[in-house]
Amino acid sequence: MFITRSRFTSYFRFHKLVVLAVLFIFPTAYAQQPLPPSGAYDASPYLGQVRNTYVYGDIWERPNLSKRDRSMITVAVNQALYATNELRLHMGRALDNGVTQTELSEIIAHVMWYSGFPTGVNAARVVAEVFSERGLPNIPSGASSRQPPADPELEFPDAYPQTPYLRDLLNQVVYAETWKRSELSPRDRSMITVAVGTALYASSEVRYHVGRALNNGVTQDEISEIITHVTFYSGFPTGVNASRIAAEVFEGRGLPLAGGRFPGAPYLGELIGGLVYGETWSREQLSTRDRSLATIAVTLAGYQSDQLRVHLRRGLDNGLTTQEIAELIAQVTLYSGFPTGVNGSRIFAEILRERGMPLPD
């Protein structure tokens, strides 16, 4: 179903009135549904529709994960992506959903090992502002300082012999210390690590931590739901990649697999068939050719090789010429870096050879 700007504006205003009315009558029951930030979707009303209908009207209401769990993984992913505005919003939402100050503090420290110190420093600054705005203590009462283990058990004693200091950090700090801290349970740590690995398209980390999550009490259905939830914050290519890997891990453990294209995250298939291709790709505001250009650019910049391959083929089918795609690769490379451009050029050359098409001049 397509909604014109005028119809959507009326719908959006009506939705806000309904939300305000329900909040007034049932403040506790509806406290979890946030109002859209003022003016946030003025320049992209369809994005606002997706936000209301799919993200908060559907995903956040699914029973497969608790609101607390969804808040934890959303904070973790937005930290990893350096999405400061969303991070601030979801830190407040996490506190409303039962995540404690101590847990928020610990999420930041945990995620930092997987997404880098700059993301941790940024998140620490943001959470301090959120605590201050809410009149909460600046230092969470349950947070503890470093307690290095005296005789750490090494999880990967033979890992990375070429970089022994990295091996020591991995074994002695990440696993023997951070993963053992009591501020978060092993289950919570596994959930946020699977979420961050999904968001960062870190395939090997997703593979390892899906297995570790199963060992730590995260169910198969919960892992599938984490992948689906994170998809809306880091993009569908990341969800497709994680779903494929999760399915392989489930199969390797003899766990039952759902049918369909995405057995690792079955609901993802419905969303891709409906929201992505059935609805968004069919909207008349952009041609399929232009949508292919945009999608190739994004998957190229994200080094998302599998999805880049899919959309390079789709771009050719949608009327893009080899010269246009070659030029697009060069253009995007200047903004995303030469490694992404070299990867894109290599994949495009493979596709052209498969199709018996000449390479661009």
Range-by-range predicted roles:
Residues 70-78, 104-108, 189-197, 226-227, ...:
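Short, structured motif recognition centered on aromatic/hydrophobic residues
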Residues 200, 302:
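Short, solvent-exposed interaction modules
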Residues 15-28:
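Bacterial N-terminal signal peptides
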Residues 87-88, 108:
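Glycine-/proline-rich flexible loop or hinge segments
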